Structures are given as structure tokens and as C-alpha cells.
Amino acid sequence: MKNLFSKVSILFSWVVLLMLAVILCPHGALANVKPAAGGMLFVGIGGMIVNASTLNNIFVNLKTTFNRCFDATPTTWNKIAMLVPSGTKTNDYKWLANFPRMKKWFGEKAVKALAAFNYTVTNDDFEATVEVDRNDIDDDELGIYAPQAEMAGYSAKQLPDEIVYDLANGVFTKTCFDGQYMVDVDHPVTDANGVVQSVSNKGTAKLVCTTQAGAIASLGASRTAMKKFTDDEGRPLNIKPNLLLVPPALEDIANVLMNNDRLDDGKANPYKGTMEVLCDARLTSDTAWFLLDTSKPIKPFIYQERKKPVFVQQIDPQAEDVFMRKKFKFGAEARAAGGYGFWQLIYGSDGSV
């Protein structure tokens, strides 16, 4: 009899609890909610019911927002850099030193051996992570996360830009495949007689549009120097500078040089329409400017991609972070790196003189 009374009491208690839950949960939503298979059920009184299905729907929406913003975000890195897919931790670029060119065939073929230069680029890990507090899901306060998902998508799409323009900022201080700085005064090049010469792709002139003479001494001299670059057999490389890369401080000057019929002194502008102007606010020097030849298969900069940016999430209700801190997570992950291509395809001036 006591056992029967005990069972009846327990059953009555469960009935009372169920009735209270139905009354307190709006619109009788609890009647249609079941725990996901193998999952936990959280009930947010007066708010959203948190279970595996709810979480999945929430993060599907966040992923959709992420992808929409990712696809809509413009980039410019591919104007000045080439994409190199990576299948390993590190890529070796010593082949840049000995790129073969067609020539007349006399006797045996001249086989280009790989040079002894050691130029490798190791992939780095990148991430952007957002925490979602379980209370915000309980309280149906998820609107604050849509802008964060958009920014995560924007940031992920901009990763190649960030890497490539950081490379541009480092051309005067970071080495390329020949062991010299990417923009330097003494790149070793063998001439037609087999003698090693020092070749410069670095200037100091300010970019100016005030006079024709000043424009010729800065922009014109740099263009001429690039066009005279030769390969390791003394043959002209046929460099054609077609892009003028500048920081915001030099954008107006660059546009005058590329668009105006006449310069500030009233004389004819010999450089109108000769190059595209590319301005990026991530260039940190207000005086440095660069000429690039981007018309060839190889570009001045390399974007090495091991893993494209992807949306990731951690939504297991039983994960330690959820149990201990009530935190779910979403964000983006990628593996990539950057490096320098042919130094002959860029001419840089620090604008110091």
C-alpha cells in the first residue's frame, strides 16, 4: 500500500510540473517539443526552447548570413598577386630563380637546373570566432549576432587582401627568392657575357604631378628602369608596367598622372592612360609608391592557399564550454600564407627625395 501511495504521489508531482510548464510556456509550445535523439532539452521560460534542432536552425541562418556577406565582399588582391594552391605545410619557390624561356635550338637542349636559393613559404592558421551566449538564445536575443556573422564573412573574404597588402608594406625589408629584399638596389643578375651585375628595382623619388620634368624624373625614370630588366642570359624580359599602386595620400597625384591631359605646369602629360591606378588604405607609407607588371602568368606577389576560409561552428549542447560557461561558438577558419614572386615585376620608390 505504501509503495502504491508513493508511486501515485510521484505521478501526481509529474502531472503538476507538466501543467505548470504548459501554462508558463507561451502558446503551449512545450506540447510539440521533444528532445533530439541523444541530445539535451533546455527550456527557456517565456523565450525560445533550446534543443539540437533549434541550435541547428540558428546556426544554419548564421552560416547563410556569413556566406552571403562573404560572396558580396569585393577584393583586389588578385590584381597584383597570383594564387598558388598548397597541398603541404610548406611550399618551395626556388623555381622562381630559373624560369625557362624559348630560344633557338642548337645541338642539345639547354636544361635549366634549379638554383641553390632557398625560398620557402609556410602556411599559417587564421581564425575569426564569435561566442553565442546560451542566455541570448533562451531570451530570443539573436539579432545581435547577425552583424557579427556578416563581419566574420567580410573578414574571411578579405584575408587574401590582408596578406598581400602586408607583403607590399614589407617589400623594402623582406627578402625574395634571390636572398635580397623584394625591392632593393643590388639584385644579382648575370649579363650576356656571364658577368654578374647588380640591378636595382628601388628608387627614392617622390611621385609628383606638378611639372612635366618632375613626372619624367620620377614616374618616367621608374618605367624606363623596369623596361630594361633582363634575364640571366642578358635578354630583355619585355616588362610592361601597367599598374600604379599607391596609398591614399598619393591617390590624387596618381589619378592626375593617369587621367589629365596636362600637368600642373600646363605641359602635356605623357603618362595619361598608360597604367591603372590601384589605391589601398592598408598601404602604411604615405610616400612610397610602386609600379607593377601584372600582365604575365606570374605576378609580383603570391597568395598561397592551403585551406579556403570556411564557416565553422561548435553547437554540441554537452560540450564543456556550454556546460561550464553557456557558450556556443561560430566563426571562420583558413590556412594560407603569402610570398614574393619575380622582383623584376615591381619597381618601388620610398618617396624620400
Predicted features along the sequence, with ranges:
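N-terminal secretory/membrane targeting signals
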Residues: 1-32
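N-terminal alpha-helical "arm" segments
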Residues: 2-5, 30-71
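Sequence/fold signature of self-assembling virion shell proteins
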Residues: 25, 32-36, 42, 49, ...
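Short alpha-helical segments and helix-capping/turn motifs at coil-helix boundaries
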Residues: 62-65, 114, 229, 315
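Assembly/oligomerization interface modules of large self-assembling protein complexes
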Residues: 68-124
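Short, charged/polar micro-motifs that form catalytic or ligand-binding hotspots
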Residues: 88-92, 116, 120, 135-149, ...
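Long, contiguous amphipathic alpha-helices that act as assembly "spine/axial" helices in icosahedral shell
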Residues: 119-176, 244, 326, 330-332
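Charge-rich, acidic-biased intrinsically disordered regions
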Residues: 170-190
